Amino acid sequence: MFPKSLAVSRKNSNLTKGVSGLRRLCSSSSTITGSPCPPRYDVAVIADLIEKQHWSKLGVHVTDINPNELFRQLISSELDPDLCLRYYSWLVKNSDISVSLELTFKLLHSLANAKRYSKIRSFLDGFVRNGSDHQVHSIFHAISMCDNVCVNSIIADMLVLAYANNSRFELGFEAFKRSGYYGYKLSALSCKPLMIALLKENRSADVEYVYKEMIRRKIQPNVFTFNVVINALCKTGKMNKARDVMEDMKVYGCSPNVVSYNTLIDGYCKLGGNGKMYKADAVLKEMVENDVSPNLTTFNILIDGFWKDDNLPGSMKVFKEMLDQDVKPNVISYNSLINGLCNGGKISEAISMRDKMVSAGVQPNLITYNALINGFCKNDMLKEALDMFGSVKGQGAVPTTRMYNMLIDAYCKLGKIDDGFALKEEMEREGIVPDVGTYNCLIAGLCRNGNIEAAKKLFDQLTSKGLPDLVTFHILMEGYCRKGESRKAAMLLKEMSKMGLKPRHLTYNIVMKGYCKEGNLKAATNMRTQMEKERRLRMNVASYNVLLQGYSQKGKLEDANMLLNEMLEKGLVPNRITYEIVKEEMVDQGFVPDIEGHLFNVSTKS
């Protein structure tokens, strides 16, 4: 704390500086606009009024000069920029006068010259947050009115930061690019929040652009910046590029940390395809070799990745290693294992894991119960599912929509449609709004029971609410095709398009399969033409399988043979279903396919 005398001395020094600046200003024969300050001004009083924020008195005192003009003259003087900032704030708040960008950024230049950086940050944050409608190019023109590139760079850097912190990522990205055009050097402190804002909007390509520009402009990245870039690349499956960025870190003297490795491991786990978990495991080994200890997040990522790769033993091995290293599992760890066990039909082991979870002091949550109820339903254990559902409600927890949907689906699959509808009504009484999944379960149940009319009625209710999705249409289409009414299924294509939904291969395959089962190969072929010409969807393996089976079962084996050759000529690889159709519908019927120049061994099943 400064002595009182010193504080007063400093205040008087600011006031003296303000007074001397105004004295020079008002003794000048002309202003910037050529209008002299009225000679009767008591400049000491003006400065003192601004210092003390006596704005009503100031307004009376300067009636002979435009407030905006006074602001221009204050900035041009040697008045302390803090006083100019106070006057600006008062002017904007208490008058209809709009301050030009040129004057606004002159103020910021004066603050930057005085090294009042925190005030610039605060000013720009409010400037952006309050919805400034100024275009970025106009702002940069105003910034460039000062010849000091260093000062301009500081202001541009803080502007990008303000845009990023206020979720104005579009403007922040444009400001970043314009900074490059003007030659203003930004810092990692503004680039990192900008990249995070872009990443939240799934603009990974723009994150990669910012990173490359940082390298080109010689902006020193830090470990946090690198981690954001790695995350963006992993989200889009660019794992090789993410690996390259890890190498770049070393070049810039940054060591990858646990977040870097976790992001890369998670990227491999979510990538899909053969060998993904082998690569994730390799990153884990590299991590340990570089003396970076795996944490709870690392283990959770691997547990989840292994069971989703149909490698439940791998998940259990990671869980054991986790315990061996004294890393305490959390609810996410247990939920992943319970999900994996339920998915693999190991219900009793899933229940046992839930019990271990509780014994370890980790309380199950709705995700835990969702996983267990889903496991019960998938394994025809409806009674156990309902008991657990009752237990959830008994604990005062509110069941999720997904939980209700699983039970409704289980009822419908057992043919207990009325019970499914009763549960939907209970759901609504509890204030839980049924979603499209709820209706899809009920429509599917009605279709399976052959009650297509009731299914269509429920579909129409859903349509009136604007809720149907592609799954809804597919369910009803399959219902019509199952009843031998494929023409009605085909008519739903138009309704689908009216709702802005785009048919996929599966959509057309359902209708083609329906026509083939009815023996109407001409209609099936017309549907293929519609798919290829109107929707520009090329036949895939599943589409060819539908027609292959249709032609074969109709006894048109030569035509089926031609389709098989056409499929191979287009470079499509037969799958297990293709081989089964060829064997059962062609070879076993005494017809050996004539494959023209292609290797096709019917004894092999891929």
From Swiss-Prot:
Signal peptide: none annotated. The keyword Repeat applies. PPR repeats lie at residues 152-186, 187-221, 222-256, 257-294, 295-329, 330-364, 365-399, 400-434, 435-465, 469-503, 504-534, 540-574. Keywords: Repeat. The keyword Repeat applies. InterPro entries: Pentatricopeptide_rpt, TPR-like_helical_dom_sf. PANTHER family: PENTACOTRIPEPTIDE-REPEAT REGION OF PRORP DOMAIN-CONTAINING PROTEIN, RESPIRATORY COMPLEX I CHAPERONE (CIA84), PUTATIVE (AFU_ORTHOLOGUE AFUA_2G06020)-RELATED. Belongs to the PPR family. P subfamily. This is Pentatricopeptide repeat-containing protein At1g09820. It comes from Arabidopsis thaliana.
